[in-house]
Amino acid sequence: SVHPTAANCCRNLEYAPGTSASSIEYGTDTTRAIMGIAFNGDAVRFPDIRFIWSHAGGSVPFLADRIDRAGNRAKEALPNGFSAELKKFYYDVAGAANRGALVSLLELVETSQIVFGTDFPPGGTSSDVARDLADTGLFSESDLRAIDRENAVSLFPRFA
């Protein structure tokens, strides 16, 4: 799983009193990492690596169409386009178990590519995240079971 940090340029920024750079920078750093892996051709060169991106992929699901249009100029690295590469990845729900984040993600990938994750303690307990996922109204009971365990087992069958 690829987890972000606050970029060196932004570690000391105080976006609002009492908040940390992580509130904005973790999602932005995830976006930078996904774009780097895709646009430098690594996702195409190493198709057997199963990337799991934290926080529902940061802002990538929301910006995918916009980035895809920019990626049209990167045909060598992205012969099938940026969105095609995004559809190969997996995404966890740590810090993103809310309707706003998940609607964009579900427009990009199937539920089978979403795995459970938490950012405990700041993101709440596993129970908190499970409740928040259910409260979005976006998932059936079977989807919630898949996100909770089954999708991870399909990625890592030896842990079944």
Functional labels for PLM-detected ranges:
Residues 1-115:
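Catalytic pocket-lining loop regions of alpha/beta-barrel enzymes
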